[in-house]
Curated annotation (Swiss-Prot):
Catalysed reaction equations from the record: 2-C-methyl-D-erythritol 4-phosphate + CTP + H(+) = 4-CDP-2-C-methyl-D-erythritol + diphosphate
Taxonomic source organism: Aeromonas hydrophila subsp. hydrophila (strain ATCC 7966 / DSM 30187 / BCRC 13018 / CCUG 14551 / JCM 1027 / KCTC 2358 / NCIMB 9240 / NCTC 8049)
Biological processes annotated in GO: isopentenyl diphosphate biosynthetic process, methylerythritol 4-phosphate pathway
Family, as annotated: Belongs to the IspD/TarI cytidylyltransferase family. IspD subfamily.
Site, Transition state stabilizer: residue positions: 20, 27
Protein name: 2-C-methyl-D-erythritol 4-phosphate cytidylyltransferase
Length: 243
């Protein structure tokens, strides 16, 4: 059995508005299988034995989080989110208690403990690691008008997923330095790569999807249903004990 070293901090940037969903509330507060997307996400993290703290970065005028039952969990700490993901994560890093942090998208409610176990084991043996899925479709490069310029070799291409796990202090420095220089930081791995760290890919499950568009809601609901059917539900945690 892998030593998972309890005491990790998970960071969940949840300050975005999710405009592509076209909903009246931010996408993380949309209902999915009886709970909000964010509740599913937080419950998956909180139920893992290695995670001792979850920091949620919220929009300054968020009026939805306090209505969630999970908001009362004493392991959850709130910070103010920024205009971009990197600023939200950096605000959370300033108060993170653990030596290692996992950053996970608020709108990825189908994360399993099996993927978390694999990520933790790999990250702690190197500079850090992220979950990913291999590109399986044929990839094309186009010009600005949409004309195909080339077919791209997909052999070494991955879709970056979350969580992404790194040592707390190096990640904080990497984000601070990158932001100070105006670098484009699309995820935590890009900041660490820029700072010279070697980041490992860990192949994750295909059902660890991010809810971005309206059609993703039904797909995420199907994945949750399938995951629950494979493992008996626990009395107070119907979706979180999944491998």
């Amino acid at each position: 059995m892998t030593d998972l070293r309890p005491g990790l901090t998970a960071i969940v940037p949840a300050a975005g508005i999710g405009s592509r969903m076209g909903a009246e509330c931010p996408k993380q507060y949309l209902q999915l299988a009886g709970r909000t997307i964010l509740e599913h996400t937080l419950t998956r993290l909180l139920s893992h034995p290695a995670i001792a703290q979850v920091i949620v970065a919220l929009a300054p005028h968020d009026r939805w989080f306090d209505t969630l039952a999970v908001a009362a969990d004493p392991r959850i700490l709130r910070v103010e989110g920024g205009a971009e993901r990197a600023f939200s994560v950096l605000n959370a890093l300033h108060v993170a208690a653990g030596e290692w942090v996992l950053v996970h998208d608020a709108a990825r409610p189908c994360l399993t403990h099996g993927d978390l176990d694999a990520l933790i084991a790999t990250a702690m043996a190197c500079d850090g690691a992220i979950l990913g899925s291999r590109v399986r479709d044929t990839m094309k490069r186009s010009d600005g008008a949409g004309n195909i310029l080339a077919t791209v070799d997909r052999e070494q291409l991955w879709h970056a997923l979350t969580p992404q796990m790194f040592p707390t202090r190096p990640l904080r420095r990497a984000l601070e330095e990158g932001l100070a220089l105006g670098a484009t930081i699309t995820d935590e791995a890009s900041a660490m790569e820029r700072a010279g760290f070697t980041v490992r890919m860990v192949e994750g499950r295909a059902d660890n999807i991010k809810v971005t568009r309206p059609e993703d809601l039904s797909l995420a609901g199907l994945y949750l249903q399938q995951q629950n059917a494979r493992q008996p539900a626990q009395p107070d945690s119907p979706t979180e004990e999944l491998a």
